[in-house]
């Protein structure tokens, strides 16, 4: 929401694709302050119903970005529907995810794109892996991992390895 507000306060439009239906108007209001209604006018919120609808939405977003005046695209969470789709149609799921990532990569050449994604623990090698694997990883310019324990920290994996400790408060992240 902070990234979106940065551009919304400059009177630019932001596209927010919310697959998990987790966008909190209350949190947006809290962070945006008294002008939140004006900022909402420039926020384009998409709520895809499934992985195919997400695919269509990303294609539509590409057209909107081409038309101009969009300053940022946020996808929260890319792999939410992908994970479910993969249980029945893995080949098609991977093909669609590749296409979606390619579109997002093209968009990112014009404007910033922020994608949140799910991870899972690999039992075989005891590591945390990205849902969508190499499809997502190789097409991402920057990879950031949020770790809760033993302390809250952000691990920037790419472009260069770094770690930052943080806490959360009403204003968002507070870096230590």
State what each model feature region is.
Residues 38-41, 68, 138:
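Structured loop/turn residues at beta-strand edges in well-structured enzyme cores
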Residues 10-11, 69, 150:
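Short loop/turn segments at connectors of secondary-structure elements within structured domains
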Residues 48-53, 58-135:
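P-loop NTPase motor core
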Residues 105-176:
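Phosphate-binding/switch region of NTP-binding enzymes
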Residues 18, 47, 77, 148, ...:
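Flexible glycine-/small-residue-rich
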Residues 1-60:
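Conserved P-loop
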């Amino acid at each position: 929401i902070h990234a979106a507000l940065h551009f919304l306060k400059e009177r630019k439009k932001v596209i927010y694709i919310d697959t998990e239906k987790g966008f909190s108007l209350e949190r947006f209001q809290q962070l945006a302050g008294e002008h939140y209604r004006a900022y909402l006018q420039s926020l384009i919120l998409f709520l895809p119903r499934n992985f195919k609808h997400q695919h269509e939405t990303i294609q539509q977003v590409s057209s909107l970005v081409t038309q101009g005046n969009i300053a940022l695209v946020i996808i929260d969470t890319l792999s939410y529907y992908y994970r479910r789709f993969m249980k029945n149609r893995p080949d098609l799921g991977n093909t669609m995810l590749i296409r979606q990532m390619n579109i997002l990569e093209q968009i990112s050449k014009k404007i910033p794109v922020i994608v949140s994604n799910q991870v899972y623990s690999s039992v075989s090698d005891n590591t945390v892996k990205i849902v969508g694997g190499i499809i997502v990883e190789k097409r991402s310019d920057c990879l950031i991992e949020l770790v809760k324990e033993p302390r809250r920290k952000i691990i920037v994996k790419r472009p260069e390895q770094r770690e930052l400790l943080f806490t959360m408060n009403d204003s968002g992240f507070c870096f230590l």
